[in-house]
């Protein structure tokens, strides 16, 4: 049934600024952008990482009714090779700490999370299993 995520969407009140911020963070420009009915940018999408996962930035005016305006809920953790360095970079770019750097057991898992300047929770994680799967797929 569930085979992997297709797109993660982050809502933003300032899509132009969010697109610039994520382009700087990721070191790439969005590969796809779409205007809304009024001609203003409504959606920008990046492909990132080893599996080219999609991160979509969406103008909040298109959010479903009842979408939370405050950070919280599910945290998607993106694998990083150095949680401390990634965490410091995010904070230096204006993100705010949501979850401090936290070792998870004794198997090498480490997580942290921030709230981006647009109100979205962004998790980062060093995950040995991610690297094992990457290695076994021949992508390492």
Protein language model annotation of sequence segments:
Residues 1-7, 26-79, 87-115, 126-140:
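Vicinal oxygen chelate
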Residues 11:
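Catalytic core of Fe(II)/2-oxoglutarate
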Residues 18-23, 90, 119:
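Conserved active-site tyrosine of GNAT-family acetyltransferases
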Residues 123:
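Active-site-proximal beta-strands of protease catalytic cores
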């Amino acid at each position: 049934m569930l085979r992997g995520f297709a797109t993660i969407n982050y809502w933003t009140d300032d899509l132009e600024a969010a697109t610039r911020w994520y382009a700087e963070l990721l070191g790439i420009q969005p590969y796809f952008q779409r205007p809304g009915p009024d001609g203003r940018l409504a959606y920008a999408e990046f492909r990132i990482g080893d599996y080219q996962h999609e991160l979509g930035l969406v103008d909040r005016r298109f959010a479903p009714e009842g979408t939370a305006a405050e950070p919280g809920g599910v945290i998607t953790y993106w694998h990083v090779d150095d949680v401390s360095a990634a965490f410091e970079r995010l904070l230096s770019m204006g993100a705010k700490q949501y979850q401090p750097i936290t070792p998870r057991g004794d198997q090498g898992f480490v997580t942290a999370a921030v709230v981006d300047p647009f109100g979205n929770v962004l998790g980062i994680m060093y995950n040995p299993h991610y690297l094992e799967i990457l290695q076994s797929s021949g992508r390492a």
